[in-house]
């Protein structure tokens, strides 16, 4: 039997399969389908025709709009029907036609989406992705498998992110951009192929980062990408100078981390 809270409101034309867990205050509209291994925490709302399936947990207060499919099998030739999972955080908005897939067994079997995110119509989160908090994915954005999107990233409409690519916190990706390489925190990337166009100064300002700090980050950016060495060599060379600047340290740590992808740069030649 399903575990359904007394205060949950389920339309008689919805299907909630035996075994599902439905929390307090959940609302499920007509023609929705909730699978047997799904957990909907308090005050989740499913509008008409929304589907939540697979081994999926949806955090409190999240709203899922019509025709979204959350928790479908991974779109991977390597998936053999294993019991993999999707976790969606609290207070997310998942608009019409959004698709989110569970993970694949070979890579831990988990797709994880954080809190307070906005997924606009027809955007896609593939298997094994990690999406942080306060992320905005505009209409038709596509994340391939194993992508990492850090906190407060904005992805413009129709942009596509290559598998295993990382996009650092507070980065901005312009509409219709092809993100083939890692994007540094606070970076601004546009185009196909995607190239860095400087820093996301507007986003940094909106985040309350002091103007003097923004100027320091700009100087560090110039030293990293216009220095005589490789990007990683230049980043290592300025670490002591900027050890007291949280934002620069985040960029330097991102550059130094192991990754399957090269780094996006301001030029067509990628510097590692």
UniProtKB/Swiss-Prot annotation:
Predominant location: cytoplasm
Catalytic activity, reaction form: a (3R)-hydroxyacyl-[ACP] + UDP-N-acetyl-alpha-D-glucosamine = a UDP-3-O-[(3R)-3-hydroxyacyl]-N-acetyl-alpha-D-glucosamine + holo-[ACP]
Disulfide cross-links: none
Localization: Cytoplasm
Keywords, sorted A to Z: Acyltransferase, Cytoplasm, Lipid A biosynthesis, Lipid biosynthesis, Lipid metabolism, Repeat, Transferase
GO molecular function: acyl-[acyl-carrier-protein]-UDP-N-acetylglucosamine O-acyltransferase activity
The enzyme's E.C. designation: 2.3.1.129
Coiled-coil residues: none
Pathways per UniProt: Glycolipid biosynthesis; lipid IV(A) biosynthesis; lipid IV(A) from (3R)-3-hydroxytetradecanoyl-[acyl-carrier-protein] and UDP-N-acetyl-alpha-D-glucosamine: step 1/6
Oligomeric form and interacting partners: Homotrimer.
Protein family membership: Belongs to the transferase hexapeptide repeat family. LpxA subfamily.
Primary role: Involved in the biosynthesis of lipid A, a phosphorylated glycolipid that anchors the lipopolysaccharide to the outer membrane of the cell.
Protein name in UniProt: Acyl-[acyl-carrier-protein]--UDP-N-acetylglucosamine O-acyltransferase
Lineage: Bacteria, Pseudomonadati, Pseudomonadota, Alphaproteobacteria, Hyphomicrobiales
């Amino acid at each position: 039997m399903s575990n359904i809270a007394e205060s949950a409101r389920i339309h008689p034309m919805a299907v909630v399969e035996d075994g599902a867990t439905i929390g307090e205050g959940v609302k499920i509209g007509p023609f929705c389908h909730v699978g047997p291994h799904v957990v909907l925490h308090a005050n989740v709302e499913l509008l008409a025709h929304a589907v939540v399936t697979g081994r999926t947990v949806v955090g409190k207060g999240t709203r899922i709009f019509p025709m979204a499919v959350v928790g479908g099998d991974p779109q991977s030739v390597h998936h053999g029907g294993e019991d993999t999972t999707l976790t969606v955080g609290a207070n997310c908005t998942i608009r019409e036609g959004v698709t989110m897939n569970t993970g694949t067994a070979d890579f831990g079997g988990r797709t994880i989406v954080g809190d307070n995110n906005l997924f606009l119509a027809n955007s896609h989160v593939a298997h094994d992705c990690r999406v942080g908090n306060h992320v905005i994915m505009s209409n038709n954005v596509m994340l391939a498998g194993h992508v990492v999107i850090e906190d407060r990233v904005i992805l413009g409409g129709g942009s596509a992110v290559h598998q295993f690519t990382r996009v650092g916190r507070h980065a901005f990706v312009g509409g219709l951009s092809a993100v083939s390489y890692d994007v540094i925190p606070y970076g601004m990337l546009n185009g196909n192929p995607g190239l860095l166009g400087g820093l996301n100064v507007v986003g940094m300002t909106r985040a309350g980062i002091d103007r003097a700090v923004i100027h320091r980050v700009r100087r560090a950016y110039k030293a990293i990408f216009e220095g005589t060495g490789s990007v990683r060599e230049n980043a290592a060379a300025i670490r002591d100078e900027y050890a007291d600047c949280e934002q620069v340290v985040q960029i330097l740590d991102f550059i130094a981390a192991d990754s399957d992808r090269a780094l996006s740069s301001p030029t067509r030649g990628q510097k590692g």
